[in-house]
Amino acid sequence: MKQMSYVTRWLYSTSHKDIGMTYLGFGMLSAMMGTGMSVMMRMELSNGNSQFFHGNNQAFNVMMSGHALLMMFFFIMPVWMGAFGNFFLPMLMGAADMAFARLNNISFWCLPPALVCMVCSVLMEQGAGTGFTTYPPLSSMSAHSGPSVDLAMFAMHLTSMSSLLGAMNFMVTVLNMRTMGLHMVNMPLFAWAMFLTAMLLLLSLPVLTAAVTLLLMDRNFNTGFYEVGAGGDPVTYEHLFWFFGQWWPTNYVNNLEYCAMCWETYNKMYFIMLLITMYMSTNLLANMVKMLMTNRSNQQVTKNRMNKPHALRGDTSPKVRHKMFMNTMSKKSHALRRDTSLFSFPKNDKVRHMYDMNSKRYKSYLMGTSETTSTKSLKEMNMPSQRTGNPAITGTNLKENKNTMENSFNQWLAGLMDGDGCFGITQNKYTNCEMTVALEDEKTLRIIQNKFGGSMKLRSGAKAIRYRLHNQKGMINTMNAINGNMRHSKRLVQLHKVCSLLNMPVLEPMILTKNNSWLTGFFDADGTMNFSFKSSCHSAGGYTSKGKVSNHPQLTISVTNKYLQDVLPFKEMLGGNIYFDKSQNGYYKWSMQSKKDILNFVDYIKLNPSKTVKLNRMLLCNLYYDLKDLKSYMLNDNNMLQNKAWIKFENKWNKKF
């Protein structure tokens, strides 16, 4: 008799054990590929800068999508159902094999072509960087025009076909292939898990396949199922996908739980029945919950439109409908009204400020999937504008305030770069920027680092810290932020060179006004602020806290620069004087000593706050002039309390914040 070859033994087999082991090997191969993608993503995210993809965000998204699809459709489902189910289910049923042995072989051979399509999807052109849910319009032809997304969808079709064939085989095996005397109630819980999983696969996978088919038609046949301009609705795909997606995580986790419980409670029949009932109800609810939520939302939107005639317009956006739904729900919920009363303090500026800041910080959060982000501000949840009567905390003004804060930060950053920063180009044509500040201003650099990336390092031999940014993505973001806000003559030359290398146009420098934060950033970098006593031997003089004979104190604010044209706008806007200092190769100093000019500058800083410790001294200026008018710096028996106040002021002034 001719011996069976290795290929025939494993690839042509209809034995449930052989096919189960083949499923297991295929799943391990897919798992290794998915693990490789996971390692790439973890290497990229191991540091704030780009470590592996060199700023290529599309490549990262492709790895994320490929990793998720491989792990779900090519590892978890084939191993749990194909490998363990095929191997153990017939033995637990007392059956010789599966009900349809050749169908079992066909269901496996749908997977290798699907894996080839999945790998080609990752490697071809720009890849499918849509996330594992492939939501439109990100997966539509306008966003991903190549064949990568089509190949990913073909892979999902083939895996769905494999799962459907396997599900039919499992269900028939459980129903018809049990040994004599083995009733459904007496089956092991593992068999129940396989049976219910197969049943739900049979119900949910056609819905997912239909959703993917409609998306393929939109991409290749110019239909408009998910195109808003053609009368379609992209949210329909979300509902169809999660009819399947809401089910599978719960199902596979339950397999582990109930299989473990099976061995502990095998002899307790009533507990077995309870677990079976719980298992069936849990899986049924997991399959129905998305449909019930969608139905509830549609009913609420319909009711809102009937109550509000202006909402019947056809161009009402989903965001507007979402706001209408949330406002109606908040009006009907007494508990929500009771909770929102805690935030209704229109006269309390501190509470209003806290609400303003928190609403900007926690304005949005993830809903459901890795790609769907839903904006649900605090105003929509529990603080409508008609309840508080305060227009300063409505959603529109929050957005305007956010844009204003962003522009102010960019102007301040440009001023800081003009003062203490520099741009450079390496021999390999890589761009970078550096910035050096005092050691006590480390928090300032942390703000910049959190926004743009980069690294910080202490300077040896100096009480200063240096910030360095060298990755391309961070440099592009920095250039976009400060372009058009730079004013320093030398920095503008460097900016032109860097922007030329990055293929970015250079905008004209902005005009310096009191509503512009550039001077604040420049003062944080190159400005000084101190007061001194003019020594005198006059008998009417007094003693400072340091015991020196002195005249009245003099407060001075100054900014230095090498170029006269850079400091002239300071004098035109805020007054003061400019003189040339020959020390240190010569530089121009803009300084002010008069009370009027200094308080004018303090008002400017309050309007455009400093982000360094210099702000602490700036806020002490009014106290300085109050104590100076009272001559608190004079040491005599008549003003001991005032002199103590002056000493306390000096301690605050010299404190290292």
UniProtKB/Swiss-Prot annotation:
UniProt-annotated stretches for the region COX1 intron 2 encoded: 246-657
UniProt PTM comment: The mature protein may arise from proteolytic cleavage of an in-frame translation of COX1 exons 1 and 2 plus intron 2, containing the aI2 open reading frame.
Gene Ontology BP terms: electron transport coupled proton transport; intron homing; mitochondrial electron transport, cytochrome c to oxygen
Keywords for the protein's UniProt record, in alphabetical order: Endonuclease, Hydrolase, Intron homing, Membrane, Mitochondrion, Nuclease, Transmembrane, Transmembrane helix
Molecular function terms from GO: cytochrome-c oxidase activity; endonuclease activity; heme binding
Superkingdom of the organism of origin: Eukaryota
Signal peptide: none
Main location: mitochondrion
Membrane spanning stretches: 19-39, 69-89, 103-123, 152-172, 188-208, 269-289
Region feature (COX1 exons 1 to 2 encoded): 1-245
EC assignment: 3.1.-.-
InterPro entries, sorted: Cyt_c_oxase-like_su1_dom, Cyt_c_oxase-like_su1_sf, Cyt_C_Oxase_1, Homing_endonucl, LAGLIDADG_dom
Membrane association type: Multi-pass membrane protein
This protein's GO CC annotations: membrane; mitochondrion
Compartments where found: Mitochondrion; Membrane
Assigned protein family: In the C-terminal section; belongs to the LAGLIDADG endonuclease family. In the N-terminal section; belongs to the heme-copper respiratory oxidase family.
Job description of the protein: Mitochondrial DNA endonuclease involved in intron homing.
The name this protein goes by in its record: Probable intron-encoded endonuclease aI2
